[in-house]
């Protein structure tokens, strides 16, 4: 009996014949679907990467010469600095900012602008410039990367910093920054505020940086 039933089923459901080109058409659809899926994954990873991991920048000015030249392209690691104190930072390759690091950051008075500078002062550091020499906590800072081309117009902030309180606001300084910075001047030094960093361009005569 089982054999007869099997035979009847086979007779009622004969094997479907494949139409010419059907296999090829199905294969084309599969290839297109796989391509679109791969493209979607690539776009998602690219968006994630530029938001959280890396981002490309182009040097717009001479403020970091001769370390970085106008037109140089950078791929910036946005992932390396943690700083939030979250527990997971201990499990990931985060590190704190260090003196000498080159950083890209948003200009405080115009969020659409990005600046490229070098970290000079860390939170709590006592900093001053005397005749263009940087002193940190009373010791001269060795800066083989610093350039003084002398081509820019004379600017007292490029030679001695911070200025005396009576001369603190100059035409070159942002008024908001001058007012804020005045609170951290002690004698002839400025104390870098908590959670803040003092950054300068390597080309000291042509850099709009933390002095301003």
Question: Could you describe each region identified by the protein language model?
Answer:
Residues 2-32, 52-58, 63-212:
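Soluble "head" domains of membrane/secretory-pathway proteins
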Residues 37-52:
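Hydrophobic membrane-insertion alpha-helices, especially the h-region
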């Amino acid at each position: 009996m089982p054999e007869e039933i099997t035979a009847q089923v086979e007779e009622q459901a004969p094997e479907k014949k494949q139409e010419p080109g059907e296999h090829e058409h199905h294969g084309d659809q599969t290839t297109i679907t796989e391509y679109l899926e791969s493209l979607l994954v690539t776009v998602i990873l690219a968006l994630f990467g530029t938001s959280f991991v890396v981002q490309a920048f182009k040097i717009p000015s001479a403020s970091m010469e001769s370390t970085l030249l106008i037109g140089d392209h950078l791929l910036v690691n946005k992932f390396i600095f943690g700083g939030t104190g979250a527990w997971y930072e201990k499990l990931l390759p985060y590190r704190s900012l260090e003196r000498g690091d080159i950083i890209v950051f948003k200009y405080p008075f115009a969020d659409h602008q990005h600046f490229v500078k070098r970290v000079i002062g860390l939170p709590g550091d006592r900093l001053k410039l005397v005749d263009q020499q940087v002193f940190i906590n009373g010791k001269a800072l060795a800066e083989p990367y610093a350039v003084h081309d002398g081509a820019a117009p004379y600017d007292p902030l490029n030679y001695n910093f911070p200025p005396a309180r009576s001369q603190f606001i100059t035409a070159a300084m942002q008024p908001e920054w001058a007012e804020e910075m005045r609170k951290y001047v002690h004698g002839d030094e400025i104390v870098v505020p908590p959670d803040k960093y003092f950054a300068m361009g390597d080309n000291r005569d042509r850099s709009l940086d933390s002095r301003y």
